[in-house]
Regions:
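Conserved SAM/SAH cofactor-binding pocket of Class I
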Residues: 3-59, 188-261
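N-terminal auxiliary segments of SAM/dcSAM-dependent transferases
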Residues: 89-167
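Structural alpha-beta junctions
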Residues: 35-43, 59-62, 100-103, 126-131
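SAM-dependent Rossmann-like transferase core, predominantly class I methyltransferases
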Residues: 139-205
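Conserved SAM/SAH-binding loop
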Residues: 65-70, 261
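A short SAM/SAH-binding and catalytic strip from SAM-dependent methyltransferases
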Residues: 78-89
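A short acidic, Gly/Pro-enriched loop at the edge of an enzyme's catalytic core
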Residues: 68-78
Length: 261
């Protein structure tokens, strides 16, 4: 299913010129990715490993990381971003844009009313010291273009780059960061699974190896390690999750590997 907001911003991107960057998350699907192949001087930045792999397969320059625009090492004429679900991610991208734009470069921001696009437009106008040029689409969809005039105070990104202790279980601290679903919570369903796993360990003993698919910040892996599991392989599609999980592995000395998948 195509995303109208992403279609809208990609159409605007195709009408622009110069060095262009599309910041992409889970909204970007393979069919739209194929249409981007024809755009010259286009780069992608994504925090989703599947998007990165698809871009590679289609020979589109792409960087996979935790939404760090500076890693592109380029000054862009256009940075285009279809707003994400998480406010901290949106603010983080907006805050970085001025440092990676050319002197006359522009930021394109697109989203729906129920995603807070009206508020984001107002905040960016204050931050960049400019008035947005706004185009409207169907179903209260808006596309805004900004040019940096005078920088104000950056937006609150919840200290996006920082890993934070969000709690402790079984005497082990749990670290996480913004940029992933449920980053500052301990999922109740996962807690139930850990309790069931503990009962299993009491009966059958701890497993020598364990695979944690969609590991998030690593809650299940850390708890499995606390309950005696041996080598643990943890994977996730999200760059923020991978960074968080790796940190938890390192501080607790967990034997195993955390990888993107």
């Amino acid at each position: 299913m195509t995303d109208p907001a992403l279609d809208f911003i990609c159409n605007a991107l195709s009408e622009s010129s110069g060095q262009r960057l599309l910041v992409a998350d889970e909204h970007l699907d393979s069919s739209l990715l194929l249409s981007l192949k024809t755009l010259p001087d286009l780069s992608l930045l994504t925090n989703r490993y599947d998007v990165y792999r698809s871009a590679q397969d289609n020979n589109i320059p792409c960087i996979f990381n935790d939404m760090d625009i500076s890693a592109c090492n380029t000054r862009f004429d256009v940075i285009a971003y279809r707003v994400s679900k998480e406010k901290a991610v949106v603010h983080h991208i907006i805050n970085q844009a001025p440092a990676s734009l050319n002197a006359k470069g522009s930021l394109l921001l697109c989203g729906f009313k129920n995603e807070g696009i009206k508020t984001y437009i107002s905040k960016v106008e204050q931050y960049l010291g400019c008035k947005a040029l706004v185009s409207k689409g169907e179903r209260q969809l808006k596309l805004a273009q900004f040019r940096v005039t005078e920088l104000g105070e950056p937006l609150d990104d919840r200290e996006y780059r920082q890993l934070t202790c969000i709690g402790e279980q079984r005497n082990l601290a749990l670290f996480s960061k913004p940029g992933q679903y449920g980053w500052n919570k301990i999922d109740k369903g996962s807690e139930l699974l850990v309790n069931a796993f503990a009962d299993h360990v009491n009966i059958a003993g701890a497993p020598a190896t364990l695979l944690d698919l969609g590991c998030g910040y690593g809650y299940l892996s850390v708890m499995a390690w606390a309950l005696g599991a041996g080598q643990i392989m943890a994977t996730d599609n999200n760059a923020a999750a991978i960074a968080s999980c790796r940190h938890n592995f390192e501080i607790h000395g967990i034997q195993g590997e955390v990888s993107a998948d």
